[in-house]
Amino acid sequence: DTYDMPTEYGSEIYAGHQPAEDSACVTALRQAGAVILGKTTTTQFASPLPVGVRNPRDIDRTPGVSSSGSAAAVADFMVPLANGTQTGGSVILPAAFCGVVGYKASLDGLDRTGIVGLKNSLDTLGYFARSVEDIALVYGAVTGNSVPADDTKPRIGLCRTPIWDEAEDC
């Protein structure tokens, strides 16, 4: 939500809806010095139905799902950063489809107060940017924490399924 712009959740029943206050994520961004330039189109209540957003990399391809307007705006250089929410893929899919960096926080990794969600046990907040460095910058600005350095060696696990022997060698 933003106190100074309509928030319609992609639905006609919320046409002209004006929140009384910012959501926690918008408050944190403003406190960090961000200027909220506008809002992008979203699908109705985060449904997977298309809403007319075009993929700036290829207008004949989908830009993704409900947060696709945010990813497309970043990919098209309209904004350097955008918020998104995810219940089942609404940050990671548009980021991949539009060729930008998408960061989906863990369940309680970022404050979701003031965000209308679908399923509290699945809804998360995320960001879109054109670089990992920009994601780290916004994460640090809104949380007050730096992104921890990963000094662990990668671990790879294989799950042997009943059809394991049918897999081809690489």
Where are the model-predicted features located?
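Enzymes and membrane/adaptor proteins characterized by extended Gly/Ser/Thr/Asp/Glu-rich
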Residues: 1-22
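Conserved small-residue hinge/capping positions at short loops/turns
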Residues: 1-8, 35-42, 151
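Short helix/loop capping segments that flank catalytic or ligand/cofactor-binding pockets
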Residues: 3-4, 112-113, 167
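Short beta-strands and strand-loop turn motifs
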Residues: 5-9, 38, 119-120, 156-161
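Short, contiguous strand/loop micro-motifs
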Residues: 11-14, 56-59, 63, 162-166
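Active-site core of PLP-dependent enzymes with the aminotransferase class I/II
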Residues: 17-23, 164-169
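Short glycine/serine-rich loop segments
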Residues: 21-139
